[in-house]
């Protein structure tokens, strides 16, 4: 489904600020895989997401979806295959537009330019049906400006918009990190439900180690631009946070020092 082959990315090459962001990344996700990604700041997690989504292009290597090479395509063209939810609830939606208008925009994502963002009765009924699935009352606020929503409501809408046209790949970039615990748990539950029901192939970056172990069928750990650990579903079932920390120390030769990494 998703394949990265020898992907590398270098920032500020040839300067005093040169930094290796990714080096020789090889990663394959099978259809329906839900892979969590853990690692400290600077490990390369966000760069990995940006290269898959088209925000950045790799300096070397290839990115392919369902056998089709896409690393040369801009972000807009990839949106027909890829949905993404960001850490910032303000990203991914248009605050001055209504919920209905945002959903109309998501509905046309990846389709030919010039397609109307307008809404007819059939499309509105579809929007209402999808909003009801969230279970937080947004179906009763279809014409409310998105900028008036709470962070949790907005992130729930972002999740719905990212999955509205059932993308082949769903990228979740620390999408619960900016929320309070109750809202974070709500978005996590909605994520699990949507991914399971739609059988979405998903890559989720998180700083919460307990969450990384609990969610999905596979876990990868990154450090200094490399994938240093790849945990299968069978092994993941019995993995503890303490064991995961120990694995990191054994492989990297250092302790996980990022204060943002949450143990559970």
Question: How does the language model describe each region?
Answer:
Residues 53:
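Helix-to-loop junction immediately C-terminal to a conserved catalytic motif
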Residues 206-207:
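H-loop/switch region of ABC-family ATPase nucleotide-binding domains
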Residues 226-252:
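Conserved beta-strand-loop-alpha-helix hinge in the C-terminal portion
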């Amino acid at each position: 489904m998703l394949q990265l082959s020898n992907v590398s990315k270098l920032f500020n090459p040839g300067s005093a600020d040169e930094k290796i962001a990714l080096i020789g990344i090889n990663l394959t996700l099978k259809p329906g895989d839900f892979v969590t990604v853990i690692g400290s700041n600077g490990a390369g997690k966000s760069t990995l997401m940006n290269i898959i989504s088209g925000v950045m292009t790799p300096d070397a290597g290839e990115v392919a979806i369902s056998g089709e090479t896409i690393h040369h395509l801009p972000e807009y063209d990839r949106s027909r295959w890829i949905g993404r939810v960001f850490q910032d609830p303000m990203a991914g939606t248009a605050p001055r537009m209504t919920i209905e208008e945002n959903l109309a925009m998501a509905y046309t994502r990846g389709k030919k330019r010039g397609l109307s963002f307008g809404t007819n009765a059939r499309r509105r009924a579809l929007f209402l049906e999808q909003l009801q699935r969230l279970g937080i009352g947004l179906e009763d606020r279809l014409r409310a400006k998105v900028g008036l929503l709470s962070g949790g409501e907005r992130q729930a809408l972002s999740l719905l918009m990212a999955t509205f046209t059932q993308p082949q790949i769903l990228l979740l970039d620390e999408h619960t990190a900016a929320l309070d615990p109750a809202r974070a748990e709500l978005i996590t539950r909605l994520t699990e439900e949507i991914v399971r029901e739609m059988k979405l192939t998903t890559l989720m970056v998180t700083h919460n180690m307990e969450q990384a172990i609990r969610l999905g069928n596979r876990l990868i750990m990154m450090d200094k631009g490399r994938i240093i650990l790849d945990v299968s579903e069978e092994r993941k079932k019995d993995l503890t946070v303490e064991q995961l920390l120990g694995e990191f120390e054994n492989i990297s030769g250092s302790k996980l020092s990022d204060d943002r990494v949450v143990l559970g």
